[in-house]
Amino acid sequence: VAASAIVACDPAMCAVLHADGFPSTRLLVLGTATADPLGSDVVVATLAVRNEFGTRLQSVYAPVVIASFGTGAGRIDIRAIAPDGTAAYEAALAADRRSRISAGGQLVRNPRIIVTGVARNALSAGDVDPRLLMMLAALADQQQVRITAFGDPSPGASSVVPLRSVQIAALGPGAEAEASLRSMLSLIDAQRQPFQPLRAALAGSSALTVEYAAPSPLGLLGGP
């Protein structure tokens, strides 16, 4: 998740996150003084948190898993908070998907974007993060863009969670193609939130990888 996100967690997990360098000001410690995870962006659902909130964790506070680690009692789910309740969140998620389908379709039809196969299908299906969609459109305004793959580094994410990373390939060998990738990277590095990525880097001279932090924002593209 982004360093700016507010993370709700049980006292033991919050202590671990703080020891790993996560700012204490961004941690919402669940317990007697904090009755619920509302006010945070994500909740770290350890066994203690699941036991505390039971079915309300999914049905009321945080319906979508954006990452999951481990199994059984040791499983840890990272869940996106629904600040206005599950029904409102699911409606916003459905509307956002419709907007992503529309924006993805525009990219597929853009003559300055080269994309085929699985990556093309992801765009058409609305499976791509809105920040990536807007970033790719901005890049295509400047030059031709070859998309080779979209990905999501988070294990165990719900199927409704958008893909938050993209790999852009050089258009050919040589210094000119590498310069084109570096030009894209410079534009991406100049972005401010919410369009500043978690990481963006060149893979040698042949590709550029961009990844955005979870959770993906809703409503960024406007209504369908």
Region locations from a protein language model:
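Short loop/helix-cap segments at secondary-structure boundaries that form the rim of catalytic
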Residues: 15-22, 36-37, 53-57
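Structured loop/turn residues at beta-strand edges in well-structured enzyme cores
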Residues: 2, 37-38
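Aromatic/acidic, Gly/Pro-rich catalytic loop(s) in extracytoplasmic/lumenal soluble domains
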Residues: 40-224
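Short beta->alpha connector loops
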Residues: 13, 32-33, 48-49
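Short acidic low-complexity segments
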Residues: 28-37
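Extracytoplasmic
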Residues: 1-12, 17-27
